[in-house]
Amino acid sequence: VEQYRDAVWQLWKEANAGFEEEKLIALDTLSSNSSGYWKLPENLEPNAVMPYCWGMKGAVETGAELPLFLYLHGSGPKEREWSTGLKICRNFDDAPSVYFIPQIPNEGDYYRWWQKAKQFAWEKLLRQALLLGEIDPNRVYVFGISEGGYGSQRLASFYADYWAAAGP
């Protein structure tokens, strides 16, 4: 079984290497400087650009697989909510770990973390993060505050096979 699992994993990596898509920025120390953005499909949400922070906390042993936390902010003004989320996540005592902290692309009717355009982003995140080989696929978590907490619960039902836990 292990031999076939490894063969399927290699084929999966090769198939994904051929995707022409925006990639995650290089994994670095979690800070406001470790940020990038993804353009989400126009047919799923108009004018949707998702800024994100992507980074590690703590010293990492060579070859160690780290937990990944997806943090979803609340529904206040998106700039303030996003910067507050980064501060909160940097203070959690969970190092070594990796965080993906997105900013909601649009306010108004599109201020929901479970909508199709954001699902596109989560599927891209999961695929790209797991392909790095540094993330423990059994320790991928989603959580948030307020609208982010609600979103984490909705996403728990959509991606139950991916999350180790989901919590508001």
Q: What residue ranges belong to the model's regions?
A:
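Active-site machinery of serine-nucleophile hydrolases
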Residues: 66-68, 72-131
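A domain-start/cap signature at the N-terminus of enzymes
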Residues: 1-66, 147
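Gly/Ser/Thr-rich beta-alpha loop segments that engage phosphate groups in nucleotides
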Residues: 76-78, 146, 150
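Gly/Ser-rich "nucleophile elbow"/oxyanion-hole loop immediately N-terminal to the catalytic nucleophile
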Residues: 59-64, 111-147, 157-162
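Hydrolases whose catalytic domains are alpha/beta-hydrolase-1, hotdog thioesterase
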Residues: 151-155
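A short, hydrophobic beta-strand element of the alpha/beta-hydrolase
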Residues: 71, 167-168
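Accessory recognition modules or surfaces
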Residues: 150, 164-167
